[in-house]
Amino acid sequence: MRKKIVTCKLLRRIRGTISAVILTLSMGMLTACSQAPESATIIAGSTSVQPYAEILAEEYMALNPEAVIDIQGGGSSAGITATQTHSANIGMSSRALKDDEKKLWNVEIAKDGLVLIVNPKNPIQNLTSDQIRDIYAATITDWSQLGGTKSKINIIAREEGSGTRSAFTELIMGEEEITPKAIVQDSNGAVRQLVADDPNAIGFISLGLVTDDVKALHLDSIEATRENIMNGSYRLSRQFLFVTDGEPIGLDKKFIDFTLSSEGQRLLINEGLIPSEEGAEK
């Protein structure tokens, strides 16, 4: 009988020990899960904003080795949607928010110019706003109509949902539609590469992404420079936004605060962007 009682006591102790271990492990897992949002974040959206966000993230992670920031593209609309569905913590947008998106928290991180680019072999240096609209509406179809050599104009445009396309449509096209004959690309880099490879192509990209293998055109005889964007003489400019579903917290807030800090703004200025008014106020 005594042996049976001892065995029962031993079993109860074992069960108690196992329960304590399980509880400890469970608490540890809960703690780890609750800490995950603090140490990792996903940022998705505009391919115009993406390269600058990558520069900011690289610097932030160098200063804060425990942080993990994953930057993804997809376009402005995709980034905003990802924020709404919580598949991304922060959305990147290079267009203004639509009415049904304005409930989202957002902040301007910088301003950017939009430029028309052609191949360096193209002799054209300047186009008017009307000429650009007519090119993209396919009313003007040959470079000879603009003083260039007789060659068909190959029109390169961004995809629907792109903030770059949205800004171009609003600022240049107005009520006109971009021709369905345009070659559609899903990133600034892809547009730039096609123009670099084709002497008869024209495209539009972010000012900060212009490289030596393409030529930026003057618009209405005004050069696309940071100074001309700031003084308003060059009118093709837009906001770069970070968007979150509600007031940002944890790592999201820390990264956004870093972006708007003097150090973050300096990084963006060095890359050719115009500092944010939000950042200037800090």
Regions found by a protein language model. Name each.
Residues C33-S87, G91-K282:
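Exported/periplasmic ABC-transporter solute-binding proteins
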Residues R2-V21:
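Bacterial N-terminal signal peptides that target proteins for export
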